[in-house]
Every structure is written in C-alpha cells, then in structure tokens.
C-alpha cells in the first residue's frame, strides 16, 4: 500500500505567510512616524503620571518625577528606574514570604 502524497504546501493558510511581497504588496515605510531619541519629549508630567497610573503602576508619581528630573543624565535615570523596579519586586517578595509564614503559623 502506498501513501498518498501530501499537498500541504500548496494549501497553506494565508495567515501563515509572513511577507506581503508574496502577493505583490509592499510595506509603505515612508508613511511611518520618524523615531525620536526621547519618547517623553513632548509630554508633560501629569500626562505621564496618568499614563503610568492607568497601566496599574502604584508608583506612577515617583516614576514620572524620575523621568522629568532635569539634573539627571540618561544613565542616572535608568539606574533610578531600575532601583524603583527592584524595590517594588523586593517588597512583593517580602509580602509573599510573610504571607507564607503567616499561613504556617495559623
């Protein structure tokens, strides 16, 4: 008994195709927005705080202040934001450990 040849390659779903050039379409890169060095360039501090708050950030005000600090260079801002993230992570781990121990005690 012989197996029937598979025609899977010819009946491939169009959702699996990655390149639009298969059908002769091209990406229109000329209409794209130009990249900027500082993504917070044209935004005020209140709007940034609101953006962080709406995304669920509990330290929105502190994070926005770090970004808008004029006397810090980019490297200092990065370190400050990473430290803020680490403090939040450490507090979460501390909370989870306390919760774990309180369950064992009761």
UniProtKB/Swiss-Prot annotation:
Q: What UniProt keywords are attached to this protein's entry? A: Apoptosis, Cytoplasm, Nucleus
Q: Origin organism of this chain?
A: Mus musculus (Mouse)
GO cellular component, alphabetical, reads: cytoplasm; cytosol; nuclear speck; nucleolus; nucleus; plasma membrane
Subunit field text:
Monomer. Interacts with NOTCH2 (via ANK repeats), the interaction inhibits the nuclear translocation of NOTCH2 N2ICD. Interacts (C-terminus) with CBY1 (C-terminus), TCIM competes with CTNNB1 for the interaction with CBY1.
**Tissue expression:** Expressed in liver, expression levels decrease in regenerating liver. In bone marrow, expressed in large progenitor-like cells, cells with ring-shaped nuclei and, at lower, levels in hematopietic stem cell-like cells with round nuclei (at protein level).
Q: Which phenotype arises from disrupting this gene? A: Mice have increased number of myeloid and lymphoid cells on peripheral blood compared to wild type controls. Red blood cells are small-sized but increased in number. In bone marrow, cells show higher colony forming units.
Q: Name one GO molecular function term.
A: Notch binding
Which gene is transcribed and translated to give this protein?
Tcim
Record protein name field: Transcriptional and immune response regulator
- Write down the InterPro entries for this protein, in alphabetical order: Avpi1/C8orf4_dom, Tcim
């Amino acid at each position: 008994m012989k197996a029937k040849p598979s025609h899977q390659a010819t009946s491939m779903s169009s959702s699996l195709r990655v390149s639009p050039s298969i059908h002769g379409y091209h990406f229109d890169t000329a209409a794209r927005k130009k990249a900027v060095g500082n993504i917070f360039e044209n935004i005020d501090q209140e709007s940034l705080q609101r953006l962080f708050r709406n995304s669920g950030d509990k330290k929105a005000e502190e994070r926005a202040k770090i970004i808008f600090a004029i006397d810090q260079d980019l490297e200092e801002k990065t370190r400050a934001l990473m430290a803020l993230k680490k403090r939040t992570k450490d507090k979460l781990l501390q909370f989870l450990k306390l919760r774990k121990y309180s369950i064992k005690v009761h």
